[in-house]
């Protein structure tokens, strides 16, 4: 009976995972492009929409590289087409409209992940050019209403490229944006190395280390840094002001672990493996309180300050594997 329950849960979860992205091209291959022109796919090709990439780059698309790599590649081909039709990769498209929803530029993660795993059935050079476009700051040539531009091409990307970090007095959610940019830039660096673009590989490898800028050893948290190079004060790791503070749908407790591309570097910042493990343990035993007048409702499923109910925490339990105590991951 227990095995049947586990099986039922697994396949129910798998069904839910495959609900989106969804088919957007008709039976004859016609679809509405990101430029709102009627287009037609190549014969046998399908065009997809509803890429909620802030959600799906973490687990869905890596799962598809294992279970259905060709489907994942077809979705990447749709993303490449969207970048050509609309001028830039979407962060989250809806029926061939840019929404500008959430942060990061995670289409590049899909491309790098698939390419690294040997899936080559897409034009990687087109995908790479689109990745460089997404990581820079250029508001021209994007086919969306003018009021949408700051969401599709946020000013945070300007600061990252111009001064090397996102000042918390210049942009909201600065820490979260910068940490996700560092990961995405690491993905771009991988592609650059693969394609022989040494100059950009070095440039984006340097950007990928940008997470170090935000770590405050005196508190043990990633913190907002203003344009004068000073930590934001006052600081409260339990505080949350939904979509209006230095983090995105989370607080300093949850976001201080978002360095998925360099866990060894994060351990070094936190004082080595033993201190890292103790610090990680403290996340799960901390007081689960949240403070503030506009606490993010997305911070949910709390075990201590680990928020299993929302995306920024989803990778954290796996960090024990990198710290040499994999049984802690299994226990959790």
Predicted feature descriptions by range:
Residues 7-27, 66-79, 104-139, 212:
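Carboxylate/His-rich catalytic cores and anion/metal-binding grooves
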Residues 7, 17, 22, 32-48, ...:
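Fold-level signature of zinc-dependent metallopeptidase catalytic domains
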Residues 28-43, 69-94, 288-295:
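Active-site-surrounding "flap" and adjacent substrate/cofactor-binding loops of secreted or lumenal enzymes
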